[in-house]
From Swiss-Prot:
Species the sequence originates in: Opitutus terrae (strain DSM 11246 / JCM 15787 / PB90-1)
E.C. code: 1.6.5.-, 1.7.1.17
Keywords: Flavoprotein, FMN, NAD, Oxidoreductase
Cofactor note: Binds 1 FMN per subunit.
HAMAP family (alphabetical): Azoreductase_type1 (MF_01216)
Keyword Zinc attributed: no
Protein name, UniProt field: FMN-dependent NADH:quinone oxidoreductase
Lineage: Bacteria, Pseudomonadati, Verrucomicrobiota, Opitutia, Opitutales
Transmembrane portions of the chain: none
Amino acid sequence: MKTLLVLNSSGRVTRSLTRRLTSRFAEAWSAVHHDAVVVQRDLTLNPPPTINEPWIVAAFAAPDTPATVREAVLRASDELLDELTAADAVVIGAPVYNFGLPAQLKAYVDQIVRVGRSFALTGDAAVPYRALLAPKPVVVMTAASDGVMLPGGALAHLNLVEPHLTAALGFIGLTDVRFVRVADSVADQAAHPHSLAAAERAIEMILPRLAAA
């Protein structure tokens, strides 16, 4: 039985391109894996808490700190990490908002990049960190206005979503990160259907590779 974790972060609950693509991916995944379990987490409707001082103190607390103290503060982080760890594959809807991640997706990343759970301190100055999560494929559905911030676009260097997710996920062990990109239709209505069709074809190409992995 294969488990797919679907994370949506678009502020648009309707008319969202990334939600459309994550839904399409989940449908195609279920068609390939007939006994699949699809776990849906909407980071917009149920946003993770942001990091604060009690969280930092609990995350870096000494091992002999009472469990009840840590568990109360880190409950949301534990839930998200347990969910991520249990998944065989992950699909993320991540539109480009003001050059970077939607705030709710950034909060999610902050909750899952956690010392002792998803990475360890090695004590070795040459290699100070070690990833703790088992490898699994991650597919990111991303959308940017008119495509100018997608690879090859005039403003691609301003797109911080792809390097941010690649770095953060790779840091905790998820190094197989693939991107499916679609241009929004703010200015070029004619190009939008072609971009969306190309993104849906990309999904069809990725799935067999994941199944064979």
